[in-house]
Structure formats: C-alpha cells, structure tokens
Amino acid sequence: MAERNTLLIVDDFEFNRLMLCDTFNDRSVIEAENGQRAIEEFERHKDELCAVLLDIMMPVMDGFGVLEYMVKNGYIDDVPVFIISADTSDKSLSRAYDLGAADVIAKPFNIRFVRRRINNIIELYNQRRHLRS
C-alpha cells in the first residue's frame, strides 16, 4: 500500500494557503480557493491525499458543502478533514464534528502546534488504513 503524502489546502485567502504550504513543505500540496474547486481537486487526487485542510467561509461553495460531499460519497473515513476557520461558534463547531471533521483549528493559530496536531492525526489515519488492508 502506497503511503499518502499529499495535502489539499482549501482557503479563499492566498496568504493563508501560502502559510500552510510553507508549514507543510515536506509534503506535496494541492491548493483550492473555494469549495467547488476543492471537490474537483479531491476527485482528481483522492488516492494521494493524506488530509484536507478546509476553511469554512468561502465563496462559490463553503467548507461545510465540501464536508457534506465527502460524507455523502464515503470519503470521510479515509481522509481526515481539518476545519481551519475563524468561525468557532458552537453551531459551527458542532456541525463540523457532527459531519466527521477530524479536528477544528481556530484562526489565528500557532503554526507549530497546528503542524503537530495535523501530522499526529494523519499518522493515526495511516495506521488505521494499514490495519484495514
């Protein structure tokens, strides 16, 4: 089984995407600026993806739309989704976790801790995939 090493980073602000790309420079990265583009990139690269880093508030399609798509199509168990958003209301947090998000990370964030949290959960998903195969 090939090791997945590609992140899909989805945020409408280029600066946020660049900061996360720089943080995860040891991995391949695919970027998307809205939810619709995220779904297109996800479908194209789903067998390579180790995680999706997903903003909530975006034009065209928001992050919840992407998360719902992943749940509907059965992808949520294979690829961890991290919500990275300034919207940390109880309603948004509940919705994210209810839909199967692996973690919710509030903006602004400490990049060192975000890297550690994301890498730890990616490793757990990798181990789970390995045990299932």
Residue ranges and their predicted role:
Residues K91, F109-I118:
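C-terminal output helix
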